Design a protein with these regions (language model features):
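Long, polar low-complexity repeats
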Residues: 45-47, 58, 62-68
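Short, polar loop motifs at secondary-structure junctions
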Residues: 29-32, 80-84
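Short loop/helix-cap segments at secondary-structure boundaries that form the rim of catalytic
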Residues: 34-42, 85-90
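Active-site beta->alpha loop and helix N-cap motifs at the rims of alpha/beta catalytic domains
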Residues: 1-33, 38, 45-52
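His/Asp/Glu-enriched short active-site or ligand-binding loop at hydrolase and phosphoryl-transfer sites
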Residues: 44-55, 95-103
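Hydrophobic faces of well-ordered beta-strands that scaffold small-molecule active sites
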Residues: 23-27, 46-48, 73-78, 92-96
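Alpha/beta catalytic cores of nucleotide-metabolism and tRNA/nucleoside-modifying enzymes
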Residues: 1-18, 64-75, 82-153
Length: 153
């Protein structure tokens, strides 16, 4: 993945697949939309990236435009942990580090209603349990859509 150079990213993904590594191409915020459409034609799954640190509203517009262009398609989200965005779009998979960084770096705990608790060493069990509940909620929310996509992987 070469953030800021969509052509190099596509070339790297193609080469990995050529060598038998089932790489998933990543479409970054700010890349030409035509590349996303091409990825969707050529690969069974694609990823959306380049969103870490961006405002949620900007992420939402980007994700909405991506889904409008490629749905139904398996889509992975890099750097998306927002419950609102995960409930709004049928991601096949997603990952983010905010489950850990929110509490430890900024004192923001989803498990406690986004309450700010700082200081000392933190036990992240409550936060992990909150995200596991969110995962179950999303599985129920998007059950029909995932069935349409053919399940796993």
């Amino acid at each position: 993945d070469v953030i800021g150079n969509p052509v190099a990213s596509a070339r790297n993904c193609e080469e990995m697949n050529r060598q038998g590594i089932p790489a998933i191409p990543t479409f970054h915020l700010g890349s030409p939309w035509s590349m996303l459409v091409d990825m969707a034609k050529d690969y069974p799954k694609l990823a959306l990236g380049g969103m870490v640190g961006k405002p949620t509203a900007l992420k939402g517009r980007f994700i909405g435009q991506a889904f409008a262009r490629v749905w139904p398609k398996k889509v992975h989200a890099f750097g998306v942990g927002s419950r609102r965005l995960l409930r709004k779009y049928p991601f096949h998979s997603a990952d983010a580090s905010n489950w850990e960084q929110g509490p430890t770096a900024y004192g923001r705990w989803q498990a406690y209603g986004n309450m700010s608790v700082r200081g000392g060493s933190q036990n992240l069990r409550g936060e992990v349990e909150w995200y596991l509940r969110l995962e179950r909620e999303l599985q129920g929310r998007w059950h029909k859509e995932m069935k349409l996509l053919g399940g796993q992987p």
